[in-house]
Curated annotation (Swiss-Prot):
Disulphide bond pairs: none
Protein name: 2-aminophenol 1,6-dioxygenase subunit beta
Effect of residue 251 to A: Loss of enzyme activity
Organism: Comamonas testosteroni
Record InterPro entries: 2A5CPDO_B (IPR034943), Xdiol_dOase_suB (IPR004183)
UniProt keyword terms in alphabetical order: Aromatic hydrocarbons catabolism, Dioxygenase, Iron, Metal-binding, Oxidoreductase, Plasmid
Length: 312
């Protein structure tokens, strides 16, 4: 078997997008809203459907672990996921299957690379809303096994450079695990871009007349970074990433974006933008890096050349 990273998606997780869609799993009902971003995810779903992956790997900033990088390690998980900040829009009944073999391989490769890793074995674990939201938005059928990865808090309690270095190692370990297990995988970076946001909610949450960028600076940073990604200027994106994080309060600080690109070996590959929009003022872009189309997806036995990124 030859492993393959088919594609990577920037797949943000505003629960409002699920709320606006009114799926049967989500208890609150809406009048719609955030259509541009939901349409963007419709395009991403079509792309994913054509890829036929074995597994979806998602790194979420809302499964926060202070000690080490944790992986879902229970074959089946179900329950109700509730957004603690927006329980009025997201109370979601989930049921998912976990690729435990691949998760264990990721943990082992991370451990061998010097990271602290741990398998989450609690059968009653309530999966965080970031993981659930991203997975629903990209694959509402819930018919593809997943690997859920926590966001180790090192970028915050150490510093951005040290934290991103850990995420770089984690991404490379993930790549090696996919190679050794022969999986055909899609990576999901569950991150918004600029994360400045409003502090008061409209009476009707889906009132789109109240939805716009929280700050001009955050919006301008988002557009600058999106343009670089669309042009395939990955090295420049990562050179600017620390400044972007500081000035736009960007959620990519939590590590998913770096993890994904490290696993993909930081390709200088133009990303496709499916859509950009705001949710409570934060900047959200749904984007795809199609490695299979570019001839960069296969992970052969000789795949040992790991390009160092700007985080090195």
């Amino acid at each position: 078997m030859q492993g393959e990273i088919i594609a990577g998606f920037l797949a943000p997780h505003p629960p409002h997008l699920v709320y606006g869609e009114n799926p049967p799993q989500n208890e609150p009902r809406s009048q719609g809203g955030w259509e541009v971003l939901r349409w963007a995810y419709e395009r991403a779903r079509e792309r994913l459907d054509a890829m036929k992956p074995d597994v979806l790997l998602v790194h979420s900033p809302h499964w926060i672990t202070s000690v080490g990088h944790h992986f879902l390690g229970v074959p089946e998980l179900s329950g109700k996921s509730v957004d603690p900040i927006f329980p009025n829009v997201f109370r979601y009944d989930f049921s998912l299957n976990v690729d435990v073999e691949l998760a264990e391989a990721c943990a082992e490769e991370g451990r061998k690379a010097g990271l602290v890793t741990k398998m989450m074995r609690n059968p009653k674990f309530r999966v965080d809303y970031g993981t659930i939201t991203t997975l629903h938005l990209i694959r509402p059928q819930w018919d593809i096994p997943v690997v859920g990865i926590s966001a180790n808090n090192s970028p915050y309690y150490l510093n951005t450079k040290e934290g991103m270095s850990e995420m770089d190692v984690l991404g490379k370990a993930t790549r090696e695990a996919i190679r050794k297990t022969g999986r055909k995988a899609v990576l999901l970076a569950s991150n918004t871009l600029s994360h400045w946001h409003f502090h008061e909610e409209p009476t009707i949450p889906e009132d789109m007349s109240k939805e716009y960028p929280a700050t001009m600076a955050g919006y301008q940073w988002d557009i600058r970074m999106i343009e670089l990604m669309r042009q395939g200027k990955t090295s420049e994106v990562f050179k600017l990433l620390p400044q972007f994080i500081d000035e736009a309060f960007a959620e990519v600080k939590s590590g998913a974006f770096t993890w994904m690109h490290a696993a993909m070996q930081y390709p200088e590959l133009a990303a496709e933008l499916f859509g950009y929009g705001t949710v409570i003022g934060t900047g959200n872009a749904v984007m795809e890096w199609d490695l299979r189309k570019a001839g960069l997806s296969m992970l052969g036995a000789a795949d040992q050349k790991q390009r160092s990124a700007a985080v090195a």
